[in-house]
Swiss-Prot record:
Transcriptional corepressor that binds to a number of transcription factors. Inhibits the transcriptional activation mediated by CTNNB1 and TCF family members in Wnt signaling. The effects of full-length TLE family members may be modulated by association with dominant-negative AES. SMART domains: WD40. Residues 280-447 are annotated as: SP domain. Belongs to the WD repeat Groucho/TLE family. The modification Phosphoserine is found at S253, S274, S306. One of its GO terms (cellular component) is focal adhesion. The modification Phosphothreonine is found at T278. Residues 296-309 have a biased composition (Low complexity). Ubiquitinated by XIAP/BIRC4. This is Transducin-like enhancer protein 2. WD repeats lie at residues 479-517, 525-564, 569-608, 611-650, 693-732, 734-766. Residues 323-346 have a biased composition (Polar residues). Residues 198-212 have a biased composition (Basic and acidic residues). The gene is Tle2.
Length: 767
């Protein structure tokens, strides 16, 4: 028992023994010190054994197949545990159950993602099987627990990692938790693997792993900070703290997870072309202000993002909210301080260009792609495009799920890209995420007559068929030199017209190479912005309106373009123009809310449509020139009968109207709003679609002449192409600044956009 460490007695044969008190005392002292050290060592060993005994008791209880003694069934040698031990054991079980619930949710998401790949018949079978799998009775649960206990002897049951309870945690009842101990012990083998694969998922299942987002996004997020916020813990070793940190995660709630892992997809500018910046310092301006111009038609350069003039200075909160009958559903408040607000003639639109990125670095992204091990294994990776290609995201199929299934899975974009891959040879390999794929939230909703809103299940031919683009490719960048508030393209697609401050520039885009304007049409005053320009159908005349009471009509057929007529109204500014199909009549939306009808042959005012209580912002013609649609800052869209000269319809919204367009061959009206929503209304029935891909004001909107698709642009730098009417996203482009205006050529082969970074961009539409 004792080590052979005692000092030997220095006795030798033949030597007489001499008794000495001092020597005896020294020996006693040495023996005492030796015994004291040995006692201390044995005490430490005893404490260690006691600690191991307590730990074994905990594992013994966790692996016990029977209920707690309080439950009525006693175990032959049930260990007596302190309340603290039961408390910690309950906390560990609680963590384990949350982990298992998370695993179930992710597996359910995988099942829901797989359902669209099946035939309709197999989909029903799978959904029924999923429903049956969720109906587990108590008897089945007890049977499963018994089988697991037989397969796993207690001596080999792996321990469940226990963690010290965090401060303030309310302990769960041990009785109910211990009933699940057998099943939890059997599942404990998954702990290590799950901890490595664990990826935070928000309440809607819309967040993907940060590392993969940085890899798959066209540009890195501006700010992605991940911090750990451990709770107050009682110490029981570094390993337990690490496991607890891994299981509980750095977030206090699912909502916090979403907030901490937002991925901002913005391009990092290479060099600032202009010292002017937006008030907020980061978001590009939305559009030149279109507010009060009653004093003088001053510059558009003072109220960032205010799209229209106001006839009176009122705050956004004071605007009429509209009637409940036709109000848009789910609209959001203004995005930031640069959205339309009260203004005067002196601050009608300071358009500051966000520092522009090189054209070859503009982020062009497919909005509905998904990078994950799931998509990678099925060759469903996101597009990897070159030289400004806009990739078609693929087919997005809505899920028809039972309430049980749909409760655990958000409606999302199905990554069916295999059949519709536009550039398979350019596709980059998907980044393998260490987690479960999560679909983005639904972005298209159908609103019925009774106001019920449901995610839209897209048909299988949503992104295929005649007249549906596959993607778009950037062709030209036209350096206008000022913020481009108006663009139009000729019917021959030879010339593009860009309107900025005080002039319209004409560009020949028929030939490749660098572009310089072939003509400059000086209009209005030099400091006033052009807000709209329209070509007559014959392409021989151009009508220009903006921050002035005068419309200019240019003769483009002359050897040198010249003004051949001017039309003057009482309103201080014009913000939108439309020309009748027969080119005999022109309509102008005025800052005072009136719609002026002009006779182009006699160059005279014919009539005014009065109804908007605030500035009229946008306009379009339908029904072969017999109806006029207008939108305004009074939150209304109005329909006018041009033959009878009266208002036919009025649709009220809870957000200002910035843009609209009528489908050329169907009864659908698309409306772009300050709330960032695009709403597609049926003009003869009380139903509509609400589209939510924009992140800020929707500033312009244009239908293709075939009517099967349309585009919208916004303050969020995005150009979105949508399927009519349900809004399946065809492609998406992210420019370097707010996209203020757009136009589509008559043959639907080209798209032109004007932006806040003082340039216009020409895209080729590829079918």
């Amino acid at each position: 028992m004792y080590p052979q460490g005692r000092h030997p007695t220095p006795l030798q044969s033949g030597q007489p023994f001499k008794f000495s008190v001092l020597e005896i005392c020294d020996r006693i002292k040495e023996e005492f010190q030796f015994l004291q050290a040995q006692y201390h060592s044995l005490k430490l060993e005893c404490e260690k054994l006691a600690s191991e005994k307590t730990e074994m008791q905990r594992h013994y209880v966790m692996a016990a197949p029977h209920q707690c003694p309080q439950g009525g069934t006693s175990y032959p040698h049930w260990p007596r545990l302190s309340p603290l031990q039961y408390y910690e054991m309950s906390y560990g079980l609680n963590i384990e159950m949350h982990k298992q619930a998370e695993i179930v949710k992710r597996l359910s998401a995988i099942c829901a993602q797989m359902v669209p790949f099946l035939t309709q018949e197999h989909q029903q079978q799978v959904l029924q099987a999923v429903d049956r799998a969720k109906q587990v009775t108590v008897g089945e649960l007890n049977s499963l627990l018994g089988q697991q206990n037989q397969l796993q002897p207690l001596s080999h049951a792996p321990p469940v990692p226990l963690t010290p309870r965090p401060a303030g945690l309310v302990g769960a009842g041990a009785t109910g938790l211990l009933a699940l101990s057998g099943a939890l012990a059997a599942q404990a083998q998954l702990v290590a693997a799950v901890k490595e694969d664990r990826v935070g998922v928000d309440a809607e299942g819309s967040r993907v792993d940060r590392a993969a987002s940085r890899s798959s996004s066209p540009s890195p997020p501006e700010s992605l900070v991940e911090e750990d916020h451990p709770s107050s813990r009682g110490g029981s070793g570094k390993q337990q703290r690490a496991e607890d940190k891994d299981l509980s995660g750095p977030y206090d709630s699912e909502e916090d997870k979403s907030d901490y892992n937002l991925v901002v997809d913005e391009d990092q500018p290479s060099e600032p072309p202009s010292p002017v910046t937006t008030p907020c310092g980061k978001a590009p301006l939305c559009i030149p202000a279109r507010r009060d111009l009653t004093d003088s038609p001053a510059s558009l350069a003072s109220s960032l993002g205010s799209p229209l003039p106001r006839s009176k200075d009122i705050a956004l909160n004071d605007l009429p909210t509209g009637t409940p009958a036709s109000r848009s559903c789910g609209t959001s408040p203004p995005q930031d301080s640069s959205t339309p607000g009260p203004s005067s003639a002196s601050h009608l639109c300071q358009l500051a260009a966000q520092p522009a990125a090189p054209t070859d670095s503009i982020a062009l992204r497919s909005p509905l792609t998904l990078s994950s091990p799931f998509t990678s294994s099925f060759s469903l990776g996101s597009h990897s495009t070159l030289n400004g290609d806009l990739s078609m995201p693929g087919s997005y199929v809505g899920l028809h799920l039972s309430p049980q299934v749909s409760s655990s899975v958000v409606y999302g974009r199905s990554p069916l890209q295999m059949a519709f891959e536009s550039h398979p040879h350019l596709r980059g390999s998907s980044v393998s995420l260490p987690g479960i794929p999560v679909a983005k939230p639904a972005y298209s909703f159908h609103v019925s007559a009774d106001g019920q809103m449901q995610p839209v299940p897209f048909p299988s031919d949503a992104l295929v068929g005649t007249g549906i683009p596959r993607h778009a490719r950037q062709l030209h960048t036209l350096a206008h030199g000022e913020v481009v508030c108006a663009v139009t393209i000729s019917s021959s697609t030879q010339h593009v017209y860009t309107g900025g401050k005080g002039c319209v520039k004409v560009w020949d885009v028929g030939q490749p190479g660098s572009k310089t304007p072939v003509a400059q049409l000086d209009c209005l005053n030099r400091d006033n912005y052009i807000r709209s320009c329209k070509l007559l159908p014959d392409g021989q005349s151009l009508i220009v309106g903006g921050e002035a009471s005068t419309l200019s009509i240019w003769d483009l057929a002359a050897p040198t373009p010249r003004i051949k007529a001017e039309l003057t109204s009482s309103a201080p500014a014009c913000y939108a123009l439309a020309v009748s199909p027969d080119a005999k009549v022109c309509f102008s939306c005025c800052s005072d809310g009136n719609i002026v009808v002009w006779d182009l042959q006699n160059q005279a005012m014919v009539r005014q449509f009065q109804g908007h209580t605030d500035g009229a912002s946008c306009i379009d013609i339908s029904d072969y020139g017999t109806r006029l649609w207008t939108g305004g800052l009074d939150n209304t869209v109005r329909c006018w009968d041009l033959r009878e000269g009266r208002q036919l319809q009025q649709h009220d919204f809870s957000s200002q109207i910035f843009s609209l367009g009528h489908c050329p061959n169907q009864d659908w009206l698309a409306v772009g709003m300050e709330s960032s929503h695009v709403e597609v209304l049926h003009v003869r029935k009380p139903e509509k679609y609400q589209l939510r891909l924009h992140e800020s004001c929707v500033l312009s909107l244009k239908f293709a002449s075939c009517g099967r698709w349309f585009v919208s642009t916004g303050k969020d730098n995005l150009l979105n192409a949508w399927r009519t009417p349900y809004g399946a996203s065809i492609f998406q482009s992210k420019e370097s600044s707010s996209v203020l205006s757009c136009d589509i050529s008559r043959n639907n082969k080209y798209i032109v956009t004007g932006s806040g970074d003082k340039k216009a961009t020409v895209y080729e539409v590829v079918y």
